[in-house]
């Protein structure tokens, strides 16, 4: 792992995950229930976490080549992720970037 990625992970762990972050504590204790599911391209320049600057637990994210959503077909990773998000977490909005 390159030094800058490792440093970023260590800062995240110290400040967000292990720090005194009430949002993270709440998500750990009560579970996650994001309102959004974002489907985006695998393009490294278009990262939803960077673009929207969300708080932890704001959305689920799925990356697909070209942000292409194929017809529903059980057994695909996107179908499984959408099923989980909608059925168990009651996601209200799906965004395709």
Where in the sequence are the language-model features?
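Short, conserved "active-site rim" segments that organize catalytic pockets and cofactor/ligand binding
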Residues: 1-76
């Amino acid at each position: 792992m390159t030094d800058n990625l490792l440093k970023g992970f260590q800062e995240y762990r110290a400040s967000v995950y292990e720090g005194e972050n009430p949002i993270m504590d709440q998500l750990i204790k009560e579970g996650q229930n994001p309102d959004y599911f974002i489907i985006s391209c695998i393009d490294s320049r278009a990262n939803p976490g960077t673009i929207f600057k969300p708080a932890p637990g704001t959305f689920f994210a799925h990356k697909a080549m070209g942000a292409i959503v194929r017809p529903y077909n059980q057994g695909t990773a996107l179908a499984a992720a959408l099923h989980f998000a909608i059925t168990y977490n009651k996601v209200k909005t799906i965004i395709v970037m």
